[in-house]
C-alpha cells in the first residue's frame, strides 16, 4: 500500500512562516506527517547575500543558517501538528543542542532537511534534525521550538 506524500509549495510555506527574503530558508516541503516528521528542500544559490562575505573566494553556506533552516522546518511541522497560533502568537526557535557540522555546504548544493517530532510539553516541542547533501549528512542537531505570545 502506497501513501501519497503531503507537500507544501512556497505559497503554503509563506502562509505559515513569518520569514521572508533573505531569511526564508525553506523552498519546498516534499513530505510530512503530522506529529511525526517533515522533509524539506533548501536550494543553495551563489546569488544569496551571505556569500558576499562568507567567503568571497570560497563561498560556504553558514552553519548557523543550516540550523535556522532546520528550525524553520520544525516550525512548519509544529503548525501542521498543533495548529496555527493565534494572531499574537508565534513558534519561536527555543534551543539547539548537540549541533554537529560534518561537511561544508556550497552554492549549487541542495539541502534536504529532515526533522522528526520527539515530544511536546507545556508549549515547547522537541525535535531531532539532520541536513543532507547528496545523501550525506552535513549537519545534525536537537532543536526545540516554543509557542509564545508576542
From Swiss-Prot:
Pfam families in the cross-refs: FabA (PF07977)
Residue ranges that the Swiss-Prot or TrEMBL entry lists as coiled coil: none
Domain of life: Bacteria
Gene3D superfamilies: Hotdog Thioesterase
GO CC term, one of those recorded: cytoplasm
Location within or outside the cell: Cytoplasm
UniProt keywords, alphabetically: Cytoplasm, Lipid A biosynthesis, Lipid biosynthesis, Lipid metabolism, Lyase
SUPFAM superfamilies found in the cross-reference section: Thioesterase/thiol ester dehydrase-isomerase
Keyword Lipid biosynthesis: yes
Nucleotide-binding is among the record's keywords: no
Enzyme class at the top of the EC tree: lyase
Active site, per annotation: 54
GO MF, one example: (3R)-hydroxyacyl-[acyl-carrier-protein] dehydratase activity
The reaction(s) this protein catalyses: a (3R)-hydroxyacyl-[ACP] = a (2E)-enoyl-[ACP] + H2O
Listed EC numbers: 4.2.1.59
UniProt-listed GO biological process terms: fatty acid biosynthetic process; lipid A biosynthetic process
InterPro entries, per the entry: FabA_FabZ, FabZ, HotDog_dom_sf
UniProt family annotation: Belongs to the thioester dehydratase family. FabZ subfamily.
Record-linked PANTHER family: 3-HYDROXYACYL-[ACYL-CARRIER-PROTEIN] DEHYDRATASE
UniProt function note: Involved in unsaturated fatty acids biosynthesis. Catalyzes the dehydration of short chain beta-hydroxyacyl-ACPs and long chain saturated and unsaturated beta-hydroxyacyl-ACPs.
Name the UniProt record assigns to this protein: 3-hydroxyacyl-[acyl-carrier-protein] dehydratase FabZ
Organism of origin: Vibrio vulnificus (strain YJ016)
Recorded name of the encoding gene: fabZ
